[in-house]
């Protein structure tokens, strides 16, 4: 075959290529549209990121992180990313089937800087990470007041050790105390009545002897009478 000549493809192959040429401009946009729609649905099903992320109850080796979730969203868990700055110590805490809005961070190094990020877990995946929060643990020499809780007393909920009583609790306590006072007062009253009755009955029983008749005979003894016979003459 001469070098300047080129062989042409078969007629059947030319037809197939011609049929694919009109589709090539539309194939890429269609695929991109489907992928973007799929990603849009997935993002719509994910919960929003947590808000109001704060770190409290700082100790030398522990802390408590808490957050809020926007209303109207189904959240079944959380995921916390903990990172120590200027050193190793990355940790991820993940928990599902819970509605808690706080978590205790333990095993921290004293006098060290950390950052945390919280994600919400929904039915279709995790939310984007929340705002990055920085905190620093206390030194070992920084002691807490004697009336405060120890580091081991930190709860998952992050509640304070001393909580003021609510109005309903105070009312219940007062009602219970009044009921007990009424029961004790009623018992004391009944006891006094029984004691007075016993003291009044004892002197009468001691001074009471067998009753006697005016003739000196006991009243209880009946005199023997002779039978009387009545005769009627007709």
From Swiss-Prot:
Induction of the gene: Up-regulated by inflammation in the intestine. Up-regulated by TGFB1 in a colorectal adenocarcinoma cell line.
BP GO terms, sorted: negative regulation of inflammatory response; response to transforming growth factor beta
PROSITE patterns, alphabetized: FN3 (PS50853)
Origin: domain of life: Eukaryota
CDD domains linked to this entry: FN3
Gene Ontology cellular component terms for the protein in this record: endoplasmic reticulum; extracellular space; plasma membrane
Keywords: Glycoprotein, Membrane, Secreted, Signal, Transmembrane, Transmembrane helix
Extracellular side: 45-167
SMART domains reported in the protein's UniProt record: FN3
Ranges for domain Fibronectin type-III: 47-140
Segments for region (Disordered): 122-160, 197-234
InterPro entries: FN3_dom (IPR003961), FN3_sf (IPR036116), FNDC_type_III_4/5 (IPR052120), Ig-like_fold (IPR013783)
Keyword Transmembrane tagged: yes
Keyword Secreted: yes
Signal peptide: 1-44
Chain positions carrying an annotated carbohydrate: 52, 97, 147
Topological domains annotated Cytoplasmic: 189-234
Transmembrane residue ranges: 168-188
Pfam families reported in the protein's UniProt record: fn3 (PF00041)
Composition-biased stretches (Basic and acidic residues): 197-209
PANTHER family per record: FIBRONECTIN TYPE III DOMAIN-CONTAINING PROTEIN, FIBRONECTIN TYPE III DOMAIN-CONTAINING PROTEIN 4
Protein name in the entry: Fibronectin type III domain-containing protein 4
